[in-house]
Amino acid sequence: IVNPNNPNGRCIAPGFLVDLAKRQHSGGGWLIVDEAFCDVDPDLSVAPHAGEGGLVVLRSFGKFFGLAGLRLGFAICAVPLSLRLEEALGPWAVSGPALHIGRQALLDKGWHVFARQDLQARRKRLDAILMAAGYNVVGGTDLFRLIGTNGARLHRQMAGSGIWTREFDFSSDILRVGLPGDENDWSRVEAALA
């Protein structure tokens, strides 16, 4: 289960997931929860319960920290499974620089608070721009927005302005739009949507 889901941002209550994991475990199964987009809303995380009742939590470093090229992820789980994963992955599953950068970023709690506030403000600003341009925001997280539209048409329109969006093969009527960075990017997005 992906929580928040990608690409629609739909969230599942943590209590439900913990209960589901217990039910899975009682039948000999696991519940794997991918929390790649969870850093923007830590209250959604079931990581504190990882290892209980067959619950495995996967976390991805690059999304929240904006370091997509840094290949770093985590499996939070019971010790026996952790040891099996460690054995399967070998001694150098993650590079030394990735570990160092990841550790520094994870420990910088002040930056986490700032980033969450900044992302939320930018998400609200993008929502206002999209709605003013006549687009319906149908989902997303504080990292991206999902709009209901002719995805291919708007994707081409935005690409013509050098703005990359994400289309989906499974649905031609949605498009994912990332948050602009600086004021120049915001101006370019507004102009491309006009």
Model-derived regions: residue spans:
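Active-site pre-lysine segment of PLP-dependent enzymes
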Residues: 7-67
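Alpha-helical scaffolding segments of alpha/beta enzyme cores, especially the outer helices
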Residues: 15, 19-22, 121, 125, ...
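Short amphipathic alpha-helical segments
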Residues: 70, 141-143, 173-175
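Conserved PLP-binding catalytic core of the aspartate aminotransferase-like
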Residues: 119-120, 130-161, 179
